[in-house]
Curated annotation (Swiss-Prot):
Residues 41-232 form the Helicase ATP-binding domain. NCBIfam families: PRK13767.1. Pfam families: DEAD, DEAD_assoc, Helicase_C, WH_Lhr. This is ATP-dependent helicase Lhr-Core. Probably part of a 4-gene DNA damage response locus in which the upstream ups system, in combination with this downstream locus, functions in homologous recombination to rescue Sulfolobales from DNA-damaging threats. DNA helicase that translocates in a 3'-5' direction on single-stranded (ss)DNA. Binds Holliday junction (HJ) DNA, Y-shaped DNA, DNA with a 3'-overhang and single-stranded (ss)DNA with high affinity; binds double-stranded (ds)DNA with less affinity. Has helicase activity on DNA with a 3'-overhang, Y-shaped DNA and HJ DNA. Does not unwind blunt-ended dsDNA or DNA with a 5'-overhang. It catalyses: Couples ATP hydrolysis with the unwinding of duplex DNA by translocating in the 3'-5' direction; ATP + H2O = ADP + phosphate + H(+). Disruption phenotype: No visible growth phenotype, signficantly reduced survival after UV treatment. No change in sensitivity to methanesulfonate or hydroxyurea. Slightly further reduced survival in a double deletion with upsE (an ATPase implicated in mating). Transmembrane segments: none annotated. Residues 249-421 form the Helicase C-terminal domain. It comes from Sulfolobus acidocaldarius (strain ATCC 33909 / DSM 639 / JCM 8929 / NBRC 15157 / NCIMB 11770). The lineage of its organism: Archaea, Thermoproteota, Thermoprotei, Sulfolobales, Sulfolobaceae. InterPro entries: ATP-dep_Helicase (IPR052511), DEAD/DEAH_assoc (IPR013701), DEAD/DEAH_box_helicase_dom (IPR011545), Helicase_ATP-bd (IPR014001), Helicase_C-like (IPR001650), Lhr-like_ATP-dep_RNA_helic_prd (IPR017170), Lhr_WH_dom (IPR045628), P-loop_NTPase (IPR027417).
Amino acid sequence: MDINTLLNTPDEDVLSLFTPQVARWFKEKYKVFTPPQKGAIPLIKKGKNVLVSSPTGSGKTLAAFLGILDTLIDLGYKNELNKQIYAIYISPLRALNNDMRRNLIEPLTELRNLYPDLPEISIGVRTSDTSSYEKQKMLKKPPHILITTPESFGISLVSPKFREKLSDVKWVIVDEIHELANSKRGAYLAGLLELYKSFIAKNNFVRIGLSATISPLEEVAKFLVGGNGDYEIIDARFVKPTDIQVVSPVKDLVHATEEEVNIGIYSYLVDEIKKHKTTLIFTNTRHAAERVAYKLRKMFEDQNIFDSDLVAAHHSSLSRDVRLEVEEKLKRGELKVVVSSTSLELGIDIGYIDLVTLLSSPKSVSRLLQRVGRAGHHIREVSKGRVVVVDRDDLVECTVLAKLAIDRKIDNIHVPENPLDVLTQLIVAASLITPIEKDKLYEIIKNVYNFRSLSYDEYNNVAEYLAGNYGLDSNKVYAKIRIKDGMISPKRGTRMIFFLNSGTIPDEAMIPVKMENGGYVGNLEEEFVEILAPGDIFVLAGKTYEFIRSEGNSVIVKKSEGQRPTVPSWFSEMLPLAFDSAIEIGKFRGKIAEAIMNEVPKDEVISSIMSEYNLSRFAALSIYNYVKEELLFTGGIVPTDKLLLIEVYDDDDQNRNFIFHGLYGRRTVDALSRAIAYIISKDLNMDVRIAITDNGFAITVPGKQEYEISKVFDKLEPDKMYEILSDVILRTEMIKRRFRHCAERSFMLLKRYKGRETSIDRRQINSEVLLGVVRQIEHFPVLKETVREILEDYMDIKRAIEIVEKIRNGDIKVATIGPNQVPSPFAHNILVKQYTDVVLAEDKRELLKELHNKVIEFLRNKGIDIDLEYTEAGIK
């Protein structure tokens, strides 16, 4: 149902569906329905499956629950309200569950104040935080509405006594479905809902999905209902007015020092904070969130602006108690500014925010809209967002993302396909609900959207593994099910294993870093360790170290004083640029380049950028200069969505760098770069280095090796890429960590067993032993899944193959320049990413400035007279 239909639906049509009591309460409290409510309530009342997509503050929750509450109240007045669970609300966040309980109790309390004889509607929360006593109480007196998480829902289904209480549920609500659909956690929940429908539910229940702005809605709806389920979509994604602007903190992004940029950023932030009641600032890393909060507190104190206690940080590394305290203070209006990484993107109720500021690119349109949507917590209030950029690439990227957001063009989500570790848990869960025919269970699993293309061989391999038919008993991997006469049933002890080990979220480990001689240095996050390769140099506690190897759950390093870091310490936290957005950035570059090449007057181009993209003159001028410099440097070539530029650059360290300017998003670039590096490494018979960014990648070869780089795509056959990359990643740190995660999800490694918890250190050591064993087993499902997860979920091999096919058939042209002793302007950030760390931000800006000066000198040496103004004042 589109937005115009929703807006034109008379309120009286919806009110007429309610009992007089609920109709009166609604009219007195809210007066009018929001578009999502106008669309969803009548459909839910009719028993239709519904996906509601709309921004924060548009009344989604009430749209889902009001019809349900009204039906329960009506049943109560008719003395037909039984002691049973009628509705299940499933949310990915426990904090959302507590919010939801409060949000449901409030209207019921207000209704009871109006009508003292209102039937009692009970609400219960069942998560890992719920005490055994509370769970026992639920068995005796189940709540009418059950609030839970995917993991606790799974445990409920295999609990013999409690699942009886779930047999007559009428509605299942999945909140924040956009957060679930693109993860294994979502695949797990989708599978659990299918098992619930097939084995426990007496009747067809209504599925209601609540989502922030997401695309494509059809795919998310299919994920919600599974199989051949019918559904209706309420598309109210763009119902709230949105005001998004990109801001440059300095007039000249090229020549400003790091100090000038920082002064510009914080001056801007303080000015905006003063003008608004509550400001929410998003950074892209937890480290940056802490840094910005600290700096603002200090400025508030030193300049006597506000009390420094009015500033708080909120991110996932903080304790739950600290996060809850910040959320409560926000709701009560006791904070002036909160700085967050990603933790406040989801729909936790955080009260009134009138400005959202993003420091640097959010990397996708949907994330931009989600973050900005936190401002103006009512449907008629403007969601006001400002994006502060730090360099020219950031400016170009954010300019395009902001325009796409205003034009309502959203990136498509990625839904994991056939995650075999999740399948393992679903087969075990099914066996614990009831003994089942193996072939019948396959048909049920195929109804789950994530498993629609699952082959019988893949399914059978997982079942055989669970039945202990791979001979892993000597490695203490025992059967969890038995298969006899085509029937699957659980082995003794399997129920307890499921209770203690089910779920898909891996334990996050801090990895100890040790010197070769055994001295302790500090800790690194596991995500960071998995991207390291021998020889990588990184910063820890302000000093540089070279990665040698990992041993079990430790990292072995040696000092590398004076050497530049090759991997930024925040790299693993960085959000990847979405593929669809990357393609649009390529188109934007091409559009500006074409105008310049066609000799459209400079002022006309700049005015056009200003008006079409809502930019200041400084920002538009900066983009114009950036593209023009690249054109002058390359002799008229700018990398776009239709042209891949390969630049050969010989650096001062006698290395040859092959720089691939390909805007395809980080996940695609990651896969593409490793495949190309494999070809070059094989041809030259030497190790090469890779540096990956959102705007392309650099492959560095020691010594100025001659290599015909333009022919590399002739050697890279698309149908061999999966095989090549599988082979490549089997030699990385990543495979060790990811295999442990998949082995834990597959019950190969047990986190908890017989009342004992196994440490992550011990599990990592055990997993590496198991990895060595299963590498010898053909088509072993847990290893196959580890490779699939890395290539399809972490990277995007499908898009990488698509790009190679387009290059080989001529849809994407390839141009080559060099070798040069100076890198082109567009190459600077790709190269600088190799050499910079957060502690060296000043060095990064100096290096960029130095590279820019070399470009100007390079052009003048070629007889090209550069005359570009860099600020409105006309600095030449």
